[in-house]
From Swiss-Prot:
Belongs to the universal ribosomal protein uL3 family. This is Large ribosomal subunit protein uL3. Residues 1-37 are annotated as: Disordered. One of the primary rRNA binding proteins, it binds directly near the 3'-end of the 23S rRNA, where it nucleates assembly of the 50S subunit. InterPro entries: L3_arc_euk (IPR045077), Ribosomal_L3_dom_3_arc_sf (IPR044892), Ribosomal_uL3 (IPR000597), Ribosomal_uL3_arc (IPR019928), Ribosomal_uL3_CS (IPR019926), Transl_B-barrel_sf (IPR009000). GO terms for cellular component: cytosolic large ribosomal subunit. Pfam families: Ribosomal_L3 (PF00297). Keywords: Ribonucleoprotein, Ribosomal protein, RNA-binding, rRNA-binding. Part of the 50S ribosomal subunit. Forms a cluster with proteins L14 and L24e.
Amino acid sequence: MPQPSRPRKGSMGFSPRKRAESEVPRIRSWASNDGAPGVQGFAGYKAGMTQVLMVNDEANSPREGMEEAVPVTVVETPPMRAVALRAYEDTPYGSKPLTEVWGREFDTSLERTLDLPNEDTFEDDAAALRDDAETGDIDDVRLITHTLPAGMRNIPKKTPDVMETRVGGGTLTDRVEFGLDLISDGGEHEISDIFRAGEYLDAAGVTKGKGTQGPVKRFGVQKRKGKHARQGYRRRIGNLGPWNPSRVRSTVPQQGQTGYHQRTELNKRLIEIGNGDEPTVDGGFVGYGEVDGPYALIKGSLPGPDQRLLRFRTAVRPSDQPRLDPEVRYVSTASNQG
């Protein structure tokens, strides 16, 4: 009988499979942007899923120009605020923060999570940052942004989610000026200022937590068959490894934490950006409620349960860019409750 040969069950690229440290996803890499300076990311809260009827605009597709049903995730995207600009310098040990410039106005809910400055030092700090940019002492700039969940009736919390978002495009001096102008004007920005319907983006979020699970569900190993199953166990692996080396290797699939991991999905297509209650299904989204404000429709599913924070960035590995502004003819409002 030939020996079966196949790749191992379960990817080692996701090790260690432990709980995420924070529900605010951490973005470690950003796309290079050669256009005008601008913010490269945004965030929203997952509401649920529905489907739309849209015209297939994929070039050279056999169904090009035909109407088709597409599943979409509805994400509520209220405006965000930028409160500070942080400058980084490259060192042999990675990028390190060099200086910060804080704005003048802050939302009252921000005091729940940050120690805000008591004095207005914006002009002096901004002048020092401009000098550092001209002399080449800094290599990158990022905005400290936050959400405003206190004004959302479907998000049961008042504490904003704080995150860093890169400023891309133009020269470093252009990016510094863009960031300073943004925070001096209050820092409010919307998803339509960053993305356009039809383009690709990357979505990051923390997946649904499933607690402790066995190796069959956690890694996808096969259940025991035949006489091996009649030994009393079907959902256990056959052994923990060889006699030598006399230890259990980390590659052995075992039971443990499943879910509540940060995952980033690449090249999710933004179908529509809107404002209002058009995508709200009859009776509201289960576990969320009604969407009545700025929203985005993303093709396909996204990680995490309803009400989970999702972060978006400009695509770092974009494939062939599809056509912008796709034609959406109908958004289904059929109830999720049957």
